[in-house]
Amino acid sequence: MGKIILATSIASSLYLTVMLKMLHFFNWIDWHPTKFLHVVDDGLTRWVVLFVILAGASALVYLMLMNIRRVPAIVVGIIFGLAIAFVAEWIIYDLSAEAKSFKRLSIPFIVIITTATVFIAETAIFHREQIEKGNELPYSTSMIK
């Protein structure tokens, strides 16, 4: 179980780190993803630290989404991803709660966060279902032995 969480969080954080670098490189976002890491001097080290932070956050999201039941994983992933993306951009831009603030939101950033969250949700819910299926008895509980 721990290996699955580790592999999923590493894959999603690698995807997010590379995509954030691309968004910043092509100027699709106005902010710098590693600006908050001003304590670290080297640019590559900042990206590595961001990767580690994203890996930890991905593992936490995995553990949270693993406990969701009776809702399709795609729906959970999209809703959770949109919420994370909107909250992140609201905090980054320090936006007010007005309708015109939506124009500042970056669609590519929202899509990237949502796809990563859908990946984590699909993996978490699939593996939880596999664990539950493995815990089932091989016979009916009403069967007389």
Question: PLM features: residue spans?
Answer:
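Generic low-polarity alpha-helical segments
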Residues: 1-11, 44-48, 61, 65, ...
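Loop-to-transmembrane helix junctions at the membrane interface
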Residues: 58-84
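Alpha-helical membrane-associated segments of multi-pass integral membrane proteins
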Residues: 3-23, 85-134, 138-145
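Short juxtamembrane and helix-loop transition motifs at transmembrane-helix boundaries
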Residues: 32-44, 66-74, 120
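Hydrophobic transmembrane helix segments
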Residues: 10-54
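Hydrophobic alpha-helical transmembrane segments
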Residues: 5, 48-52, 75-79
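Transmembrane alpha-helix boundary/anchor motif
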Residues: 56-63, 115, 119
